[in-house]
Amino acid sequence: MKQVPEFHEDFYIPIPLDINNLSAYSPFLVPQDHLGNQGIFMAMSVFMFFIFIGGASINILTILCTIQFKKLRSHLNYILVNLSIANLFVAIFGSPLSFYSFFNRYFIFGATACKIEGFLATLGGMVGLWSLAVVAFERWLVICKPLGNFTFKTPHAIAGCILPWISALAASLPPLFGWSRYIPEGLQCSCGPDWYTTNNKYNNESYVMFLFCFCFAVPFGTIVFCYGQLLITLKLAAKAQADSASTQKAEREVTKMVVVMVLGFLVCWAPYASFSLWIVSHRGEEFDLRMATIPSCLSKASTVYNPVIYVLMNKQFRSCMMKMVCGKNIEEDEASTSSQVTQVSSVAPEK
């Protein structure tokens, strides 16, 4: 029986290779052509380039827009700016390195840069993830009024922005200190938490379960509960005003928005959660590394589609962006449903 060569400390390839020196396949030293043809790497490079350009542009524009237009700086818009900062974090620290590495077909920047890139991209991704949960919670708090006549003020908005960063640091720091680690993932051209190696030295299984519970199940449960309560509240309001066409239209549009928001979250994080759980439950089995690249790509792509869902579908933000970029002043309907859904401060104005 052929002896299986020992894996290198800084990377892991879950497929059999007819070679005793796995260091010769190091993703920090040589192109990873044994994992796929050059066309796949070039396609991924182009994809990451567009994600970088699109993600950086739309999120910088959101931040600049908020700075320029005072009416966008409401307390309940703080978290949307926080989401844009998190997306910008991923777009700047994750996508460019991946783009250049895919172009060279290996992680050309070395093991130390891999740890840094993995940490920063994970940090930004987790901040964005928790920001989506906070968006849902704040809307539930203001629209459903579970605390009665509650006024959402600056301290609440600031706390809502700080919480995602604390939660993200709690999730992204452990691999730097021995609980799991950051290594090349998928086609070995980008880095992230180690969720598929068989090395028990890093306790990867427990870290994966921690991420699944704390960074997927809890935020997703929060989003489903809060938006579910919001829909129930609006349905009751629509039932009470059955003769109002605008109320009925509002309920339909809110329902569509909620579905889009929940699907956006699932597209971003469900592949990571499901694939990592499959790896943990099928420890040591071979799998296609090209499939392992998909979750990373979808999470990085969220830097583009999350702003579209949460910012560009907001009439106030969209109008201000058009005015800033094109000089056009689009007339807003302040009573519109889109404003009620994405600019929730209009539902419960401050006293």
Swiss-Prot record:
PROSITE patterns: G_PROTEIN_RECEP_F1_1, G_PROTEIN_RECEP_F1_2, OPSIN
Tissue: The color pigments are found in the cone photoreceptor cells.
GO molecular function: G protein-coupled receptor activity; photoreceptor activity
Residue ranges, Extracellular side: 1-40, 104-117, 181-206, 281-288
The protein, known as: Blue-sensitive opsin
Residues with attached carbohydrate: N21
One of the record's GO cellular component terms: membrane
Subcellular location: Membrane
Family from the record: Belongs to the G-protein coupled receptor 1 family. Opsin subfamily.
Bilayer-spanning residue ranges: 41-65, 78-103, 118-137, 157-180, 207-234, 257-280, 289-313
Gene3D superfamilies on file: Rhodopsin 7-helix transmembrane proteins
Record membrane topology: Multi-pass membrane protein
Listed GO biological process terms: phototransduction; visual perception
Post-translational modification summary for this protein: Phosphorylated on some or all of the serine and threonine residues present in the C-terminal region.
Protein keywords: Chromophore, Disulfide bond, G-protein coupled receptor, Glycoprotein, Membrane, Phosphoprotein, Photoreceptor protein, Receptor, Retinal protein, Sensory transduction, Transducer, Transmembrane, Transmembrane helix, Vision
Cysteine pairs bridged by disulfides in the record: C114-C191
Function as written in the Swiss-Prot or TrEMBL entry: Visual pigments are the light-absorbing molecules that mediate vision. They consist of an apoprotein, opsin, covalently linked to cis-retinal.
Keyword Coiled coil in record: no
Native source organism of the sequence: Carassius auratus (Goldfish)
Annotated InterPro entries: GPCR_opsins (IPR050125), GPCR_Rhodpsn (IPR000276), GPCR_Rhodpsn_7TM (IPR017452), Opsin (IPR001760), Opsin_blue (IPR001521), Retinal_BS (IPR027430)
